[in-house]
């Protein structure tokens, strides 16, 4: 009686006040299928009631479609997609006894949609807005349309004109692009040239295509033209991505040729910070905004695919008119968790003069690059040809993993039919043991060194040789999951591995032992710890401490005072964005219909690896993932600039 009970519960909240049987049944079905929440329907009720009797309850159906669209990361709903969203959103594999079949439900939605559109037309102009488009009307919640309009117009203005800087001379270009052991390619040089001349540039490319090299070169060029160090900001959406940005820049500075001591020192002091830290405060009460602009002349943002529409709006509003904005990113990675895919919209514009695409990767071998390309194109046959097979039932699979090729390779470890949980758990444990995370493994030994108590990493926050060795070992491997819950998710795998670390027991507090990977889940500036920071427990001065890398420094915190955190033997692919590991295991869910299976999650997962990646799951799950690509409708349009 699930549908009947849900209809009764909704009626207690006045949802809807009247309405036909079909309207009530559709809304209940969407709630049971968890495609819409009670809170969202209460908001819909408030919108309908504000219309003061001007619309009938069919408006609930249209608003439900808008909420489902927004949940999918879209800033708007195209009217032509409404029926499909509602039908998919209300699909239930095993329909309750008191419900209609999926086919009957779909017919019900189609029958109700015309009245829903008519009701929406009456509501238009207040909380929801209609924007005509050549490929169908776009419907927005007012907040989203305001953000789309602001981002589109601001970026269009930035990209439309030069900032008055003269082109780089050949001498300037040579001085800025000198590196030991390699030369910049034509596209990288073009990116440096454009950044000097334009107020807005997007540099896009996959891992290893040289985005950080471009940043280093453009900083050298602009600083040689007297751009002050305190007028520059490097930022990223997450703490880990910001940290990695600073680390990567210092690595490239070390390889820079012909760099005088003063400029090298300045470049090495640049650190990445989160966009939230850059803007100060929290939304909507940012410290820096349109009324109080940032005192900057250049802002470089990495991992821009992760920036949602509203954060992009806040960032752009806070920039002075004469400030350059450079966005770096890979459009093939996962988009932001929240609404929008601004980077994807901009990169997707053909021949856009503000976009430079880098295509030559120096990180991946030809085989690995072919694998990544196959994932992006959704070509299962090419993926199979570009990967090596590891037998799921082979207990020695990790040995063969290393034997087949030493590095730069992608592997597949597929179960026939359904995944075997007991075998998977054996493989997860074998992986953790192989990479020194369990028992007397190398990470555990390094973290248990009694000499750490007096090490300068703990006493002075310096990245000592001991601390560097620990972090290097920690990043030798990582298990990446698509989902958080269940045996093939973050929680299940972390619980399995920490039990093995504690001889089969699930500890009340895992931080009482050394060598346990930990990830911060809440920004805590007072501790200099941020969401996404990954550290490890070590033998401290007065018990167990947790140390985190911070460029050439170390942040240390007593385990008992650690802010909100979780284990990090495994982490989601989403959380891994902006990170690199030598070897990764990407674990697919056992349900091929899982909504989080898509090309971007597979691509993002395997490209976190610097050496090897192995995908564990079923072939049907992989096929399902490659058949889907996240396509978001944001409405951000700069076409008139192209």
Language-model region placement:
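Conserved pre-motif I regulatory segment
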Residues: 172-200
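Interdomain "pre-motor" coupling segment immediately N-terminal to P-loop NTPase/helicase cores
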Residues: 98-168
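Short mixed-charge
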Residues: 93-101, 253-267, 444-467
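Intrinsically disordered, low-complexity N-terminal extensions of AAA+/P-loop NTPases
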Residues: 1-97
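ASCE P-loop NTPase helicase motor core
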Residues: 189-192, 196-402
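C-terminal accessory regions
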Residues: 533-642
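Conserved helicase motor core of P-loop NTPases
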Residues: 332-518, 524-527
């Amino acid at each position: 009686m699930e549908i009947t009970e849900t209809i009764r519960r909704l009626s207690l909240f006045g949802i809807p006040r009247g309405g036909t049987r079909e309207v009530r049944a559709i809304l209940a079905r969407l709630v049971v299928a968890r495609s819409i929440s009670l809170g969202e329907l209460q908001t819909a009720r408030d919108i309908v009631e504000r219309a003061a009797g001007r619309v009938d309850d069919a408006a609930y159906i249209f608003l439900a479609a808008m909420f489902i669209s927004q949940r999918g990361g879209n800033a708007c709903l195209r009217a032509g997609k409404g029926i499909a969203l509602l039908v998919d959103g209300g699909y239930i594999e095993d329909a309750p006894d008191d419900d209609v079949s999926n086919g009957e439900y779909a017919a019900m939605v189609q029958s109700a949609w015309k009245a829903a559109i008519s009701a929406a037309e009456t509501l238009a102009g207040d909380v929801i807005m209609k924007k005509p488009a050549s490929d169908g009307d776009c419907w927005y919640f007012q907040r989203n349309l305001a953000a789309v309009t602001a981002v589109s117009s601001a970026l269009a203005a930035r990209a439309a004109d030069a900032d008055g800087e003269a082109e780089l001379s050949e001498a300037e270009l040579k001085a800025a692009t000198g590196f030991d052991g390699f030369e910049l390619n034509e596209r990288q040089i073009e990116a440096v040239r454009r950044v000097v001349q334009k107020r807005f540039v997007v540099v896009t490319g996959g891992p290893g295509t040289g985005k950080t090299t471009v940043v280093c070169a453009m900083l050298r060029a602009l600083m040689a033209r007297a751009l002050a160090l305190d007028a520059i900001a490097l930022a990223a959406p997450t703490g880990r991505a910001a940290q990695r940005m600073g680390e990567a820049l210092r690595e490239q500075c070390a390889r820079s040729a012909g760099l005088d001591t003063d400029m090298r020192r300045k470049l090495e002091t640049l650190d990445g910070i989160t966009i939230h830290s850059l803007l100060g405060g929290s939304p909507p009460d940012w410290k820096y905004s349109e009324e109080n602009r940032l005192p900057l002349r250049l802002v470089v943002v990495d991992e821009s695919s992760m920036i949602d529409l509203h954060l992009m709006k806040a960032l752009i509003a806070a920039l002075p008119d004469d400030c350059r904005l450079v966005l770096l990113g890979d459009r093939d990675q996962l988009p932001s968790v929240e609404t929008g895919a601004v980077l994807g919209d901009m990169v997707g514009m053909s021949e856009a003069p503000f976009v430079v695409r880098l295509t030559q990767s120096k990180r991946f071998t030809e085989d690995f690059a072919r694998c990544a390309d196959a994932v992006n194109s959704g070509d299962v046959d090419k993926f199979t040809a570009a990967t090596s097979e590891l037998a799921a039932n082979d207990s020695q699979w990790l040995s063969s993993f290393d034997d087949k090729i030493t590095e730069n390779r992608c592997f597949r470890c597929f179960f026939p039919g359904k995944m075997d949980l007991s075998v998977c758990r054996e493989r997860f444990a074998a992986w953790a043991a192989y990479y020194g995370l369990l028992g007397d493994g190398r990470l555990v030994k390094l973290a248990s060194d009694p000499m750490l108590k007096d090490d300068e990493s703990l006493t002075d926050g310096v990245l000592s040789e001991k601390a560097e060795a620990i972090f290097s070992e920690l990043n030798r491997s990582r298990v990446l999951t698509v989902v958080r819950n269940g045996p093939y998710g973050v929680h299940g795998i972390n619980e399995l591995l920490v039990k093995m670390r504690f001889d089969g027991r699930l500890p009340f507090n895992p931080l009482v032992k050394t060598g346990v990977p930990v990830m911060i889940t809440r920004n805590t500036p007072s501790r200099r710890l941020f969401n996404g920071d990954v550290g490890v427990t070590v033998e401290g001065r007065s018990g167990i401490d947790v140390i985190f890398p911070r460029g050439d420094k170390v942040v240390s915190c007593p385990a008992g005072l650690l802010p909100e955190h979780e284990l990090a033997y495994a982490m989601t692919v989403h959380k891994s964005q902006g990170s690199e590991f030598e070897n990764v295991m990407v674990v697919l869910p056992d349900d091929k219909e899982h909504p989080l299976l898509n090309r971007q999650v597979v691509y993002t997962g395997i490209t976190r690896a610097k050496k090897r990646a192995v995908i564990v799951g079923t072939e049907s799950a992989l096929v399902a993932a490659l058949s889907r690509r996240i396509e978001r409708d944001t409405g951000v349009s700069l076409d008139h600039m192209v």
